[in-house]
């Protein structure tokens, strides 16, 4: 049963974050014809962002012994049992989300659409609510160790925020 929940969590994340939201951004943007340089920029940012997210997921599974899919305090897949402070979690406390944002910023550059930007801003706002709720739970789960980690590691943007 645990394997089914793991797979479900990964599939939901793939469908929502990698396919559905970018598809919505693209559909709302209308008839877009970016040049080669813009497409290359998108490809580089998409690869970097998705790569960071995948690294974070693998690290979470191997070190944290859990899964990333925990939506607004509803456990979709098994939660992590170990606090992760190394690997991609040394970069920021939410490297998986940072990777998604890098991917979406590449998409925004490619689409050059205010409608896609509105989707991004709405997604960003919802995800920040999720992150704040998740951080409260992590403080409960890991106590002082998590509080110390928060003091040393930025929430989302390395060295800034």
Language-model-derived ranges and their functions:
Residues 91-98:
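Histidine-centered phosphotransfer motif of kinases
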Residues 1-86, 98-161:
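Membrane-anchoring alpha-helices and their flanking helix-loop junctions
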């Amino acid at each position: 049963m645990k394997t089914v929940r793991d797979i479900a969590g990964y599939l939901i994340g793939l469908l929502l974050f990698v396919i559905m939201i970018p598809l919505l951004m693209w559909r709302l943007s209308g008839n877009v014809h970016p040049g080669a340089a813009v497409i290359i920029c998108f490809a580089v940012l998409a690869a970097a962002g998705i790569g960071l997210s995948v690294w974070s997921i693998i690290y979470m599974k191997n070190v944290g012994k859990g899964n990333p899919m925990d939506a607004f305090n509803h456990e979709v897949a098994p939660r992590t049992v170990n606090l992760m402070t190394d690997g991609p979690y040394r970069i920021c406390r939410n490297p998986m989300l940072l990777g998604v944002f890098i991917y979406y910023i590449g998409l925004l550059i490619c689409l050059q659409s205010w409608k896609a930007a509105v989707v991004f801003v709405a997604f960003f706002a919802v995800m920040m609510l999720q992150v704040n709720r998740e951080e409260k739970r992590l403080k409960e789960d890991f106590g002082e160790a998590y509080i110390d980690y928060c003091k040393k590691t930025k929430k989302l943007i390395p060295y800034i925020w």
